């Protein structure tokens, strides 16, 4: 029996130093969120009603543009569908026959006189192009708001101004589709 105790004591003496050198552990939790880029507009229509030829008309209510994605976003604007009989005037000139101009401004309140002189005196910054998307940054479409680095759930106010053709044969209601595109905030 004594020899069993010696064997047991010998095993303890052999195993004990091993437990003193056992590895210590720590855990790492890795997290990830997949970026979700999304934009919503409300309402999704605006009716200028009747406008006179060769005049500019500013909207009386805004369109709310909301980043409903999960990260900060940049926005761009573009006319993606316009009236078949008209072309977009993308220069600082006033619209001529069968031409129109659609301008936009991000501003917390109705822009009022901010638009005065925008066409042709202030260039093309606020003109929505059909030929290409335009960044909604501090230069383009910016009043006291812009579409650069809009936080998740952030809403900015978009106001339109319509420049009517100097003359037209299209006397029925015309539709213009403006597309707001959202990009991750490093786009511009």
Where are these regions (language model features)?
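Sec-dependent, cleavable N-terminal signal peptides
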Residues: 1-25
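Signature of Gram-negative chaperone-usher
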Residues: 23-188
